[in-house]
Swiss-Prot record:
Provenance organism: Gluconacetobacter diazotrophicus (strain ATCC 49037 / DSM 5601 / CCUG 37298 / CIP 103539 / LMG 7603 / PAl5)
Lineage, uppermost ranks: Bacteria, Pseudomonadati, Pseudomonadota, Alphaproteobacteria, Acetobacterales
UniProt-listed InterPro entries: NADH_DH_suCD, NADH_Q_OxRdtase_suD, NADH_quin_OxRdtase_su_C/D-like, NADH_UbQ_OxRdtase_30kDa_su, NADH_UbQ_OxRdtase_49kDa_CS, NADH_UbQ_OxRdtase_CS, NDH1_su_D/H, NiFe-Hase_large
Protein name: NADH-quinone oxidoreductase subunit C/D
Catalytic activity as recorded in UniProt: a quinone + NADH + 5 H(+)(in) = a quinol + NAD(+) + 4 H(+)(out)
Annotated region described as NADH dehydrogenase I subunit C, given as residue ranges: 1-192
Physiological role: NDH-1 shuttles electrons from NADH, via FMN and iron-sulfur (Fe-S) centers, to quinones in the respiratory chain. The immediate electron acceptor for the enzyme in this species is believed to be ubiquinone. Couples the redox reaction to proton translocation (for every two electrons transferred, four hydrogen ions are translocated across the cytoplasmic membrane), and thus conserves the redox energy in a proton gradient.
Listed GO CC annotations: NADH dehydrogenase complex; plasma membrane
HAMAP family: NDH1_NuoCD_1, NDH1_NuoD
Amino acid sequence: MIVPDLVADAMTAGPPAAKSGDGATMFGQVSDLGPGTVLAVETARDGVPTAWIAPTSLRAVVGMLREPAAALRMLFDLTAIDERQRAHRVGQPDCAFTLVCHFMALGGAGDALRLKVPLPAEAPRVPSIADFWPNANWYEREVWDLFGITFEGHPFLRRILTPPTWTGHPLRKDHYARATEMPPYSLTEDQEMAEQQALRFDPGAWGMARHSAHSDFMFLNLGPNHPSVHGVFRIVLQLEGERIVDAVPDIGFHHRGAEKMGERQSWHSFIPYTDRVDYLGGVMNNFPYVMAVEKLAGITVPPRAQMIRVMLAELFRVASHLVFYGTMTQDVGQLSPVFYMFSDRERVFEIIEAICGFRMHPAWFRIGGVAMDLPRGWDGLIRDFLDYLPPRLDEYEKMVMRNPIFRARTIGVGAYDVSEAIAWGVTGPGLRACGLEWDLRRKVPYSGYDQLEFDIPTAQNGDCYDRVRVHIAEIRQSLRIIRQCLDGMPAGAIKAEHRLTTPPPRARTMHDIETLIHHFLSVSWGPVIPPGEAHACVEATKGLNSYHLISDGGTMSYRTRIRTPSFPHLQMIPLISRGGMIADLIAIIGSIDFVMADVDR
């Protein structure tokens, strides 16, 4: 009797209307192609217009959306859904798998279009679109790796997140999710040799020549345990002397199935897992996840909780950018700054620990609000830090950004322009360093960012130096935002008065046996979220981070898609390193600002 009430309560808020702007224009372009191309139309709870198109029409539709390039349209994400166990599919074409392409227009207010392609259970296949959007290359490899969907015409369709010897496709519903579901593991000597052999790099398999007209090429493994690659990450370099001819990034060593875990945890208990994706981002990882759940549930977050979320997220942005700043200087040979900046980061963690109880991974956001109210004395801690850090940043400006050696190592190195950034799916500071003033907090404001005053730092050259400059300027803008949160923190509730708020406010749970049962079910089973799908995106520390969640009317997500900024950013390494030296590559890697858990999930 209780569970249906929870569902009915959440379903009172219908899906929002489709947005206008370039997203509607893209949708209109697709709709004009006629019924032979568009199989169905739907609007998800996030309001993103969605068109189902036939597999044979995919390239024609994508090619049309690619032009004109001046429209600043980005292939934001490409993923898939295993529909075979999904119960609620009203109005959707019958299929076993769905390919999902998410497009975003950066020329205006960030409007979006979602294309879906229905695919059969046996030998699902679609044509590759990597020649239209180069960032589709890795996304298509990921979909083939995890779902077994073949992309015809893809130049190098091979596993990317799982080992080359892996059997099966992990995000299919019939694939095991835990080691306890697998046979006991054993590794014979022959299997060990086969695993080692599978890791050997074959240049011919990647279309790489072994010789030039003048010399033999050397192939060098940089990583997976080199300190300059910032994690377990391998780049195979094709070298002529010390000059880089080409590079092949090899990722997946950190992959631990975060999206698969989302199908086994309750909506509430998955929150701590989000912290571990970008492990330097803390609650910034919670942000898009809880926003997506709140869209599905129809929850409106109180103003005080929204402001607290923004303040904590910006504190973590400062902490993450300080790590980037210090490690970047260390990568190019300066040893002192990293110690100063990590000391400053400790001050941020002292504030976060005082508010949240934990430092790096507080898992502090909740569905409908935050875990608890601000403690006594929080404002004094933050005010002291806001006075402390700006003079330190001034010192770092003299120490690092005006240093002639640092400038020589970074100016003009690893440069790309706006069109290349959009084609490769670059967002965040890496995009703004090219000169495009586009920040989701300003263009598509969420959680009250539209009530705050801040600038969008940009640069012009898109090189290593400018990427560092933008990060530094963003620290100052984050301090500006935090000060406004400090001075304008509203009074009121920290959780929404909604039956799907999890955990529910304690005042609502101690009245009688009925309210106690609601509390017990909400905490033990988790909230029952009504059927639907929703996408939520935030301007995270390294770029745009989004969650696309599908509910089938249960206590767990049917599909959890995590789109991280670091994944497409690393894909650009070959483009911006060709012709450079190995020392230049070290600076390029440091300037991208990534962590491998954010890449591999």
